Amino acid sequence: MKKLLFSAVSLDIGGIENALVNLLNYLARTDKYEITLFLEKKEGIFLDKIDKKIQICVYCPNDSKVIILRKGINFIKQTMFKMKYKNKYDFSCAYATYSKPASFVARTASKNSCLWVHSEYMQMFDNNKSKYVEFFEG
């Protein structure tokens, strides 16, 4: 059985979230995959629509206003995540590409990772290619 990981911010209302739930439930019905969904916030109207076979985990970065505290805590969280999950999955996908934590989770969990692009990112970064590249390279 192949192990798949998907990461997102939450399952709040929206097109990306609805598409993710539909994809996960479709994959779960095939019984070919062990699926894990990492969320930054375990909340949203689609949460109860997720198939019971899908494991839901939380990876929530610290957002303290005290920069040194935030960076220290997040460094520890990232290190612990890497120790536990680095390359443990056959495939991983950051389904919320606007989220650096979701991207980190997917890039760490598998050598075969992808970023689901559901937006026009060059517009988000005012057509500044260096900002665009910096965002996606982490």
Predicted region positions:
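Membrane-interface segments of envelope glycosyltransferases acting on lipid-linked substrates or membrane lipids
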Residues: 1-138
